[in-house]
Structure formats: structure tokens, C-alpha cells
């Protein structure tokens, strides 16, 4: 959970930029996108094997 507090003399835009950077660093959005839909374990294995084949080449 990212908590960002408004600093004295800081604009809302700067605070929002800091918040976005913090969320990206923690990987919160990436994890939410990954867990958005259920993926069966067999499909996960298939995708993993496919990506590994591409990395070996």
C-alpha cells in the first residue's frame, strides 16, 4: 500500500506524479493487471513454455 502525503509548497500535480512513480515501483498495477482474469494452470504452463522457447532462440 503506497501512502503519499502532500508536502508543504507542493502542487497536486507533483504529488500525483510521486504517487504514480511509487505505485509503478511497487508493481501494484502490474499485479492487478496480471490478476484481472483467471488463467487456468494448464494455460499458464503453456504460456511459460512458449515464452521460454522464444528466449532460447
Swiss-Prot record:
One of its GO terms (molecular function) is structural constituent of ribosome. NCBIfam families: S21p. One of its GO terms (biological process) is translation. It comes from the Bacteria. GO terms for cellular component: ribonucleoprotein complex; ribosome. This is Small ribosomal subunit protein bS21. InterPro entries: Ribosomal_bS21, Ribosomal_bS21_sf. Belongs to the bacterial ribosomal protein bS21 family. The lineage of its organism: Bacteria, Bacillati, Mycoplasmatota, Mollicutes, Acholeplasmatales. Keywords: Ribonucleoprotein, Ribosomal protein.
Amino acid at each position: 500500500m503506497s501512502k503519499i502525503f502532500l508536502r508543504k509548497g507542493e502542487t497536486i500535480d507533483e504529488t500525483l506524479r510521486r504517487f504514480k512513480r511509487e505505485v509503478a515501483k511497487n508493481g501494484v498495477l502490474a499485479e492487478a493487471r496480471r490478476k484481472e482474469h483467471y488463467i487456468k494452470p494448464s494455460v499458464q504452463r503453456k504460456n511459460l513454455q512458449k515464452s521460454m522457447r522464444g528466449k532460447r532462440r
